[in-house]
Amino acid sequence: MFMGEYEHQLDAKGRMIVPSKFRYELNERFVITRGLDKCLFGYTLEEWQNIEEKMKSLPMTKRDARKFMRMFFSGAVEVELDKQGRINIPKNLREYANLTKECTVIGVSNRIEIWDRASWNGFYDESEDSFEDIAEDLIDFDF
């Protein structure tokens, strides 16, 4: 399980150090793709296979299902950690997530998310005040 928030930087070549706490679970290779809210999602290869199986059940007769699958899968790339624990984030994904030099990497249960730091801070500030309301509105879930 992934959890926590870490600040890292992109270098001039588009490489970013993956938080050491995430490296073990991700293994040497994992998948990153376009996420929601203009961030990137990162999945273990095993979790990626689970997602692929779920996506296969989406009805191809539904336009939105086709659009979502195209965006999600066309942006996916398998990345490999180098000896310094870095991954190379392709230009198209850096542009999608507006990644600049300063990044925030967060753990969200079964995935990691890579955010531009300013975007994450804005999202967090906007969401912080409504955190309890969101929890109440979602489902009856008890901690």
From Swiss-Prot:
Gene3D superfamilies hit by this protein: Transcriptional regulator MraZ domain
Residues in SpoVT-AbrB domain copies: 5-47, 76-119
Superkingdom per UniProt: Bacteria
InterPro entries the record matches: MraZ, MraZ_C, MraZ_dom, MraZ_N, MraZ_sf, SpoVT-AbrB_dom, SpoVT-AbrB_sf
Alphabetic keyword roster: Cytoplasm, DNA-binding, Repeat, Transcription, Transcription regulation
One Gene Ontology cellular component: nucleoid
Repeat found in the keyword field: yes
Gene Ontology terms: biological process: negative regulation of DNA-templated transcription initiation
Pfam family, one: MraZ
Gene Ontology MF terms: DNA-binding transcription factor activity; transcription cis-regulatory region binding
Keyword Nucleus in record: no
Subunit structure: Forms oligomers.
PANTHER family reported in the protein's UniProt record: TRANSCRIPTIONAL REGULATOR MRAZ (PTHR34701:SF1)
NCBIfam families: division/cell wall cluster transcriptional repressor MraZ
HAMAP family: MraZ
Family: Belongs to the MraZ family.
UniProt protein name: Transcriptional regulator MraZ
The organism of origin for this protein: Staphylococcus carnosus (strain TM300)
